[in-house]
Structures are given as structure tokens and as C-alpha cells.
Swiss-Prot record:
Record PTM Hydroxyproline, positions in chain: P101, P103, P104, P106, P107, P109
Comp. bias regions, Basic residues: 84-97
Family stated for the protein in its record: Belongs to the adipolin/erythroferrone family.
Record: glycosylation sites: N230, N282, N293, N320
InterPro entries: Adipolin/Erythroferrone-rel (IPR052136), C1q_dom (IPR001073), Tumour_necrosis_fac-like_dom (IPR008983)
Annotated organism of origin: Rattus norvegicus
Protein's recorded name: Erythroferrone
Gene name of the record: Erfe
Quaternary organization: Homodimer; disulfide-linked. Forms trimer, hexamers and higher molecular weight oligomers. May form heteromeric complexes with C1QTNF2 and C1QTNF12 and, to a lesser extent, with C1QTNF5 and C1QTNF10. Interacts with BMP5 and BMP7; the interaction inhibits BMP-induced transcription of HAMP. Interacts with BMP6; the interaction inhibits BMP-induced transcription of HAMP. Interacts with BMP2. Interacts with heterodimers composed of BMP2 and BMP6 in vitro, the interaction inhibits the heterodimer binding to its receptor BMPR1A/ALK3 and thereby suppresses expression of HAMP.
Length: 341
């Protein structure tokens, strides 16, 4: 059966195989002249087959061939540059996502109130602050004394600190006042007094009476500092010019009940503290009290601030503008203190 095959069919199959091999090797079209096409071999002519052991001859197609994979990778790398860069795209996308700032939102709800701090806790914190201030002040004074006097004895606790730790809450405030009074920044009171009326004084009706004959009580809280007080005349002369706080309190007893009937406009008392005994011409402190609803024993007081020149005196006057006499009881007091210049 093999001998019956025609040699023309074999040659056709061999030509097709050669064409497929040429296409597999990537023979470019530019290797042939333009306009020429591969023509099949005419029948009857057979190309000699190359030996099997000989290596393939080099062709021009290998010098001009391009690997499809390398071309694709080069295209991918070049596509990430320029306008197609991923960094530029991300930045642009972020800018677009931010957009324009909108209006501020409404305020949030109010927070819960803070914790309630009882007064006991606040007082304890105040005590701690006071202890620190006292310790700092005492240590400063101790260092100052060490610079001027030799050291003596071993270290001992401050008496002010010991007293502070042993006192209760009420004593802490008293200690604070004492510390402020002892502080060099607290001004010293140069003039002050507190005196009382020695005996009862009779004041007739429709009369203006200047009170006198005082004494200095020997009780806790009584004070006298500086000159100027005349206990006999009841006049206090200002040792220096300045502002003085003055006060007077009288205990008054009616010796005779006022006449019956409707109260009269003149049935009243005036308590005054005058300068130079000129109550009408100079500034004075005054209190007015009606007698229509008063009892047999009552109290009338006056207080305020006057500016006194050096050498000017003040005194207490009682104006009995009523229809009956009265008595100012002993123990009524008169006081003054220099506030400042």
C-alpha cells in the first residue's frame, strides 16, 4: 500500500510542515522582498533534508524577535509613570474626598454637674494650706534669726505648728487672725481706747448735755493705746490727723413718765459725737430716737467715721428733746480707734 502513494502528495505535506516550522521560528515578513509571497514547490522537485545531527542554522529572525512577556512587563512599568502614576491618583482622590469645609455643627449637650464638695473637706484643705503658710513663714524667720544670732540647742518643732495641730476647727480661724496680726505687713494701731461711764448722769428735759467722768475697765477686751483721752472731761484729742472710727452706747432710764395724750414731735432723744463741741457747725455722728413707744429703760447707740485734725477733740452729747428728765446709767461706753492717715 505504501508503494501505491503518489509522490506529489508527500511533497505537499512536506511543504506545509516547512511553512509551519517557519511560522514557529518567527520568520518576519521583512526578510523577503516586498510583494513576494512564498510559492509552493512544483511537483517533482524535492528539497534535500538536512542531516539529523547537524545544529540548526542561525537565522536573522532571532536578532529581531521580541519576547511577548518582556514587552508586556515593559508596558506595565511605563504605565505607572507620568499621568498614570498611582501616587498622583491617590493624592487627587484624597483631595476630592475632603471637599469644602461645612458649617459648624450645633453645640453638644451640657455635661453633668461636678461633684459636691462638703464644707468639711474644704475646711481641711484650708487647714493644710494654712499649715504650709505658717511653716514657710516660721522657717523664713528662723533663717533670718540664724544670720544675726548664734545657733542654740537642737532642732525643735515650731510652737505655732504644734498649736495649730492640736486645735479644732474654730481655733484655726483664731490662729489665722493672730498670725495676720503678728505679720509685719499688718499695720500697727497707734491710737485707740475703750472707756465706760463711771456713774449715773442726770439730763434735764429740753437740754443738751456733754457726758464725762469715764474710767478704763479692767476686763478682757478693754484697750487703750496712745495719748489724748481725758477721762474727767470725756474728751478725746486726736494725737495725729487721720480717720477715726468712733462709737457710743448709752443705757437710758426715764425718771418720769411723759405726759399722757398723743406723742409730741419733740419727744425724742438725739445721741451725737461732735468735733470741738460744735455739733451744728462741724461734722458729727447722730442717732435720733422717739420716746412715744419706749420703755422705762432702753439703749441708744451711734457709730461712724470722722476725720480729725491733730489736736481736735471729740466728745459724746445727749440732746433730751422731751418733756421729762432722764438718767444715763453708769456703764455706758465710749470708744474710738485710728483707722489710717
Amino acid at each position: 500500500m505504501a508503494s501505491t502513494r503518489s509522490p506529489g502528495g508527500a511533497r505537499t505535506l512536506l511543504a506545509c510542515a516547512s511553512l509551519l516550522a517557519a511560522m514557529g521560528l518567527g520568520v518576519p515578513e521583512s526578510a523577503e522582498p516586498v510583494g513576494t509571497q512564498a510559492r509552493p514547490q512544483p511537483p517533482g522537485t524535492e528539497l534535500p533534508a538536512p542531516p539529523a545531527h547537524s545544529p540548526p542554522e542561525p537565522t536573522i529572525a532571532h536578532a529581531h524577535s521580541v519576547d511577548p512577556r518582556d514587552a508586556w512587563m515593559l508596558f506595565v512599568k511605563q504605565s505607572d509613570k507620568g499621568i498614570n502614576s498611582k501616587k498622583r491618583s491617590r493624592t487627587k482622590a484624597r483631595r476630592l474626598k475632603l471637599g469644602l469645609p461645612g458649617p459648624p455643627g450645633p453645640p453638644g449637650p451640657q455635661g453633668p454637674p461636678g461633684p459636691f464638695i462638703p464644707s468639711e473637706v474644704l475646711l481641711k484643705e484650708f487647714q493644710l494650706l494654712l499649715k504650709g503658710a505658717v511653716r514657710q513663714r516660721e522657717s523664713t524667720e528662723h533663717c533670718t534669726r540664724d544670720l544675726t544670732t548664734p545657733a542654740s540647742g537642737g532642732p525643735s518643732r515650731d510652737p505655732v505648728t504644734q498649736e495649730l495641730e492640736s486645735q479644732d476647727q474654730g481655733a484655726v480661724l483664731a490662729l489665722l487672725a493672730a498670725t495676720l496680726a503678728q505679720s509685719p505687713r499688718a499695720p500697727r494701731v497707734e491710737a485707740a481706747f475703750h472707756c465706760r461711764l463711771r456713774r449715773d448722769v442726770q439730763v434735764e428735759r429740753r437740754a443738751l448735755h456733754e457726758l464725762g467722768v469715764y474710767y478704763l475697765p479692767e476686763v478682757e477686751g478693754a484697750f487703750r493705746r496712745g495719748p489724748g483721752l481725758n477721762l474727767t472731761s470725756g474728751q478725746y484729742t486726736a494725737p495725729v490727723a487721720g480717720f477715726y472710727a468712733l462709737a457710743a452706747t448709752l443705757h437710758v432710764a426715764l425718771t418720769k413718765q411723759p405726759r399722757k395724750g398723743p406723742p409730741q414731735p419733740r419727744d425724742r432723744l438725739r445721741l451725737l459725737i461732735c468735733i470741738q463741741s460744735l455739733c451744728q457747725h462741724n461734722a458729727s455722728l447722730e442717732t435720733v430716737m422717739g420716746l412715744e413707744n419706749s420703755s422705762e429703760l432702753f439703749t441708744i447707740s451711734v457709730n461712724g467715721v470722722l476725720y480729725l485734725q491733730t489736736g481736735h477733740y471729740t466728745s459724746v452729747f445727749l440732746d433730751n428733746a422731751s418733756g421729762s428728765s432722764l438718767t444715763v446709767r453708769g456703764g455706758s461706753h465710749f470708744s474710738a480707734i485710728l483707722l489710717g492717715l
